Amino acid sequence: MTSVGGKTTAITLDAGFVKALTSLKLTPGTIGSATLSKAGVLTFPITGGNVTYYDPATKVRPYVQGEIDHSGSGLSLSAGGKKVELKDFVIDPGNNSHVSGDVYLNGKSVVKGANLFRLDGSTLNPVMKDGDAYVLEGTTVYVSTDAAALLNKTFGTDAVTGDLKVGIAKLTVTGK
């Protein structure tokens, strides 16, 4: 198990996700030190955690295990005078890979540790080394069923589904 020291999780947003936000008139924003580039890459700083990577040639599954923390940053979605904030993400790459986080509506806590995104690691490329960092790229990120229900209820729609593809993740991680 390796303690995670930092770097970033970047998600290249899928065109379908951006189109869905636009059709719902949802305005995305960032929280804390998260960024959203004009090229559609949403980036969150990694603040800690631990991770173990097993060679995919072995029988160990899932071959990435642990947790990766993103305290103090997140994503906001606004429309019709309502602002939903999804923040303090925790990536769990193990069995039933997902991202959990805290949910706020107009500044008030709604849910702590909600299952926000589902991860499909079957699309993950082999780990690469980049200087002092390890790069895990290719995991597909989807809106979770729980998050879809929450967003639909909040914004009065049924358009957000649990299979809505958010994008492709790239984690750049350093150890402590």
Give, region by region, the residue ranges found by the protein language model.
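Extracytosolic secretory-pathway proteins
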Residues: 1-79, 83-176
